[in-house]
Regions:
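Flexible loop/turn segments at secondary-structure boundaries
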Residues: 71-74, 95-96, 115, 162-163, ...
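Glycine-rich, aromatic-flanked loop segments that form ligand/cofactor-binding clefts
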Residues: 150-162
């Protein structure tokens, strides 16, 4: 079974308490306090290796981790060591990866609205690969690039593919904020040929969405990209041969999710590309969620509760929508388990509510769990992606700590914010 087909990290064990990476989760919560993000190193490495193995029979396949899923220095070092480059979308992600002593040559800069400052910073830092979303960005790139920088670009297009996923994470449909419409490609190519001489057009890029289970969506994406590449090459006497098919491959958040394995997905990609092996010399793939999600869990401590007369029982935890906004944003579903020993406890139906001042701060609604008590530890699975990376300081609450576990050892890789750090960037004018 592929890692992305598992809800839990591969080292998860139930001894007396729940264990991951050889570490007792209840003891971790006591040592580091909660909320606490926990990343299992073995699961992360195994996931990376599945991708590398799936494409080991292909030349010139570039696996680029989508850093937006979770961009942390220690994790970037692990991911690089397993053979990945990095899809980055901001100066902050570039800075983080550079600070981890990773070469800028391993980065591809994406994003639909890169600022002047970000483009200039990327170029000055040594980033030379860009995926370009619009005409203004072409102009900015050419303006800031020097003649000797050899800036390689891909044009991001919207292929018109609507995959089965949440509306907010579809990106490949025609009505999208991302990329050039197919009808705009010729104008972009002509500008690069005739005006923007500092830019080297290498190929095309598309990204059709996130949390995708339908393999035919990727097949359709590749067919459209190759068809457009052929048309451009013929019309403009070019020899473009690079494709970037993005990421978006799905994971198993609940028992109702049935994602295909990494190997099954790779087989479809390779079989489709095999028809064009003489035309496509380089392929970029940008998995993010499917690399880091399963490796991560979040620990919460149970606090009080509220029993609505003749209604729901709300159980409160010490985190919620500030450390995981996805349930509130997308009605995202997760799987939760009591980390404490609970063999003798009866089951009950409860709603797990966060601590934040919003009625929508509900992590789980009407689920069955062993009877919960104050100071119990809940473990929410599959929180490696788009939890810490989307976290906020709502209600002036500090962002949680993150630890890496492996072989019964735990190491802090992100320190919990301090109260004084919450006001470090604030200023009171002298006139007040």
């Amino acid at each position: 079974m592929s890692v992305n087909q598992s809800i839990k990290p591969i080292t998860t064990l139930r001894l007396t308490n729940l264990n991951i990476g050889g570490c007792d989760l209840v003891k971790l919560a006591q040592e580091y306090s909660t909320p606490l993000y926990v990343i299992d190193e073995e699961t992360l490495r195994q996931t990376c290796r599945e991708y590398v193995e799936a494409f080991s029979d292909c030349e010139n396949v570039h696996l680029m981790y989508a850093s937006k899923a979770l961009c942390i220095k220690a994790l970037s070092k692990i991911i690089e060591s397993e053979g990945f480059g990095f899809d980055v979308v901001s100066a902050g992600e570039i800075y983080t990866i550079l600070d981890a002593k990773i070469s800028p040559e391993k980065m591809l800069f994406n994003g639909n609205n890169k600022s002047k400052e970000e483009i200039n910073y990327a170029l000055e830092s040594g980033v030379r690969k860009f995926s370009v979303d619009n005409f203004y960005e072409l102009e900015l790139l050419n303006k800031f690039a020097s003649k000797n920088q050899n800036v390689e670009i891909l044009l991001r297009i919207t292929p018109g593919i609507e995959c089965h996923t949440h509306d907010y994470i579809q990106t490949g449909q025609i009505d999208s904020k991302f990329g050039f419409d197919l009808s705009q490609i010729d104008e972009a190519v002509e500008l690069i040929q005739n005006k923007y001489k500092k830019l080297k057009l290498c190929g095309l890029h598309a990204h059709i969405g996130s949390q995708i289970f339908e393999l035919k969506s990727y097949q359709g994406e590749i067919e459209i990209l190759v068809k457009e590449l052929r048309r451009i090459n013929k019309k403009y006497s070019l020899n473009l041969s690079v494709l970037n098919i993005g990421g978006g491959f799905g994971v198993k958040y609940t028992e109702y999710d049935c994602p295909p394995s990494v190997a099954e997905w790779a087989d479809v990609v390779k079989a489709t590309l095999a028809k064009y092996k003489d035309e496509i010399t380089s392929l970029y793939i940008e998995p993010g969620r499917s690399i880091i999600s399963t490796a991560g869990v979040t620990l919460y401590t149970v606090g009080g509760y509220k029993q609505v007369p003749n209604g729901r029982k709300y159980v409160f935890v010490d985190g919620g929508m500030a450390d995981n906004p996805r349930p509130a944003l997308y009605d995202a579903k997760y799987t939760v388990e009591l980390a404490n020993n609970h063999q003798k406890r009866k089951k009950e139906i409860v709603t797990i509510a966060g601590r934040f001042c919003e009625s929508g701060d509900i992590l789980f609604k009407d689920i069955e769990l062993p009877q919960l008590k104050p100071d119990d530890i809940l473990c929410v699975y599959n929180t490696g992606a788009y939890n810490y990376s989307m976290a906020s300081n709502y209600n002036k609450v500090e962002k949680p700590q993150m630890v890496l576990v492996n072989n019964s050892q735990s190491d802090i890789i992100v320190y919990r914010e301090r109260l004084d750090e919450l006001v470090m960037t604030e200023n009171i004018p002298d006139r007040l």
